[in-house]
């Protein structure tokens, strides 16, 4: 029976589940728990409710599963700016060592490293060299009665590397003259390089308020091919090209020009139209980025290039007990012998076989610069004579050594590329709430009603248990009292008529 008999009055009352079903906002259950016997209508309503509940659980589990797959979407936008910070520009001559600056002591210590001499300090293939160069090299490589002096790789690179003051023919930024003093010396795998707008030494970062040519950096360089080292052997540092390597990067990112730079050839004016990109990536579990504020051992700001340099430095120091000149830290610089026998092979091994040693994640915030390059030939036939007179160089020399580099913003805007969470908690709750409303007509308040019903049900059961314990204790006490009273059943000769509606408490008193 769905109706239960009241213990106090003997009347029929609805059960607690029936009361809840008829007062709850949960759809359908009032038709299941109705007063009366089981009917087909109640069964159909029960099937419909259970089916809807099953569909709700299936759809909700799918939404929860999608949330925990941590998907992301990418938002691309273009923002117009009033002004933009001009990027740092690092440039290196592809020839790291000026031949005329080499000394006998340099060749004694580093001749094999430069592939100019063999292990016996002899010129390996003299027939490949230009006679003039060969004669100069023979004079410098004459070690008869020579007493070697101390040798420092840092001093060697600083002295022998190309000097920007000699290379630069003119420099302009936004139409205003600039010079070698506006560049900072940095060391890379190419040796002595120069960075424009580095922001170091307390110098303010340069900005630009216009896009297009004439509103950026324009420099004319002489790459000095006459100073290039003769090549008759190959090492890790050997290059067969002539020109400069250039990298455009943010000031917080160290140059990694050997992998990220682009080449600029002599005999051409190269136009580089760039656009700033600001990228935002998500951390785990939505992405794989690492916070830029989490610095490294040798760099305060995290970036992929900083991570690579940091990792290579630690690897070389661990394996060779020294560091290359372009590497940060306080370990001693590698000698030429350590360079050739340990450092260079170790870097090659790191790149080829031990790539898992340097796993550098993308920073969560990154600034990079897209580039579009175009070139025109210089000098033109009409300007050749003028340039010959201006620089006191032949047309052949100008064509083989002079280049012009023009770097500018394509437009005064920047592009934002941002990863966003495809599915957040608010969307998950909204979807589940919508499914609940669709299938069972429930809401958050309905769930609160369920919890309230469960609470009242538990409270009622606990009170019933406590009431029964008190009733049993009272009954035992009454039984002991009745045993001490005299038995009057023999003296009572008439029948007591007790109405059927008399309360149980009165009957107990009469019975006692």
UniProtKB/Swiss-Prot annotation:
Gene Ontology molecular function: ligand-gated sodium channel activity; monoatomic cation channel activity; monoatomic ion channel activity; monoatomic ion-gated channel activity; pH-gated sodium channel activity
Sugar attachment sites: 365, 392
Induction behaviour: Expression in a subset of neurons may be regulated by neurotrophins.
Lineage: Eukaryota, Metazoa, Chordata, Craniata, Vertebrata
Activity regulation, per record: Inhibited by the diuretic drug amiloride.
Name of this chain's protein: Acid-sensing ion channel 2
Tissues expressing the protein: Expressed by sensory neurons. Expressed by nociceptive sensory neurons, spiral ganglion (SG) neurons and the retina (at protein level). Expressed in outer nuclear layer of retina (photoreceptors) and to a lower extent in distal and proximal inner nuclear layer.
Pfam families membership: ASC
All ranges on the Extracellular side of the membrane: 59-427
Keywords assigned: Cell membrane, Disulfide bond, Glycoprotein, Ion channel, Ion transport, Membrane, Phosphoprotein, Sodium, Sodium channel, Sodium transport, Transmembrane, Transmembrane helix, Transport
Entry's transmembrane regions: 38-58, 428-448
Modified positions (Phosphoserine) in chain numbering: 8, 11
Signal sequence interval, chain numbering: none
Ranges in the topological domain labelled Cytoplasmic: 1-37, 449-512
PANTHER family in the cross-refs: ACID-SENSING ION CHANNEL 2, AMILORIDE-SENSITIVE SODIUM CHANNEL-RELATED
Topology in the lipid bilayer: Multi-pass membrane protein
Phenotype upon gene inactivation: Mice lacking Asic2 display reduced sensitivity of a specific component of mechanosensation. They develop hypertension, exaggerated sympathetic and depressed parasympathetic control of the circulation, and a decreased gain of the baroreflex. They also display altered rod phototransduction and neurotransmission, associated with increased light-induced retina damages. Despite a normal hearing sensitivity, susceptibility to noise-induced temporary threshold shifts is decreased.
Species: Mus musculus (Mouse)
Transmembrane among keywords: yes
Locations listed in the record: Cell membrane
């Amino acid at each position: 029976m769905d109706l239960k008999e009241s213990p106090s009055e003997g009347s029929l009352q609805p059960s607690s589940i029936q009361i809840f079903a008829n007062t709850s906002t949960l759809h359908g259950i009032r038709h299941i728990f109705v007063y009366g016997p089981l009917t087909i209508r109640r069964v159909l309503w029960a099937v419909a409710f259970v089916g809807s509940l099953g569909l709700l659980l299936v759809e909700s589990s799918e939404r929860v599963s999608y949330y925990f797959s941590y998907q992301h979407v990418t938002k691309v936008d273009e923002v117009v700016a009033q002004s933009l910070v001009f990027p740092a520009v690092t440039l290196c001559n592809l020839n790291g060592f000026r031949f005329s600056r080499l000394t006998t002591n340099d060749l004694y210590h580093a001749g094999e490293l430069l592939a100019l001499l063999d292990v016996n300090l002899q010129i390996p293939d003299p027939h490949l060299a230009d006679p003039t160069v060969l004669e100069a090299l023979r004079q410098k490589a004459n070690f008869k009665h020579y007493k070697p002096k101390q040798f420092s790789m840092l001093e060697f690179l600083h002295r022998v590397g190309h000097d920007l003051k000699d290379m630069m023919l003119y420099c302009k930024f936004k139409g205003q003259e600039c010079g070698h003093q506006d560049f900072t010396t940095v060391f890379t795998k190419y040796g002595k390089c120069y960075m424009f707008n580095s922001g170091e030494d307390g110098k303010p970062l340069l900005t630009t308020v216009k896009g297009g040519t004439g509103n950026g950096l324009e420099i004319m360089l002489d790459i000095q091919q006459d100073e290039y080292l003769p090549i008759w052997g190959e090492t890790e540092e050997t290059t067969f090209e002539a020109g400069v390597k250039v990298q455009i990067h943010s000031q917080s990112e160290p140059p990694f020009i050997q992998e990220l730079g682009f080449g600029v050839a002599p005999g051409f004016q190269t136009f580089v139209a760039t656009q700033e990109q600001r990228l935002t990536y998500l951390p785990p579990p939505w992405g794989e980025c690492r916070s830029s504020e989490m610095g490294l051992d040798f760099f305060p700001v995290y970036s992929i290039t900083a991570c690579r340099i940091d990792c290579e430095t630690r690897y070389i120091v661990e394996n060779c007990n020294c560091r290359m000149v372009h590497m940060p830290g306080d370990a001693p610089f590698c000698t030429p012998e350590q360079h050739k026998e340990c450092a260079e092979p170790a870097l090659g091994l790191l790149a080829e076989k031990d790539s898992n040693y340097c796993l550098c994640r993308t920073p969560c915030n990154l600034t990079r610069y897209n580039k579009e390059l175009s070139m025109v030939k210089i000098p033109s036939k009409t300007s050749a004579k003028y340039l010959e007179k201006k620089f006191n160089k032949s047309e052949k020399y100008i064509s083989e050594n002079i280049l012009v580099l023009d770097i500018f913003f394509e437009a005064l805007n920047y592009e934002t590329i941002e990863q966003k969470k495809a599915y957040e908690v608010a969307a998950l709750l909204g979807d589940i709430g919508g499914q609940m409303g669709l299938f069972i007509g429930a809401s958050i308040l309905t769930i609160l009603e369920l919890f309230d019903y469960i609470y009242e049900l538990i409270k009622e059961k606990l009170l019933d248990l406590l009431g029964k314990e008190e009733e049993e204790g009272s009954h035992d006490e009454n039984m002991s009292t009745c045993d001490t009273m005299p038995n009057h059943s023999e003296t009572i000769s008439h029948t007591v008529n007790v109405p059927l509606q008399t309360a149980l408490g009165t009957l107990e008193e009469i019975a006692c």
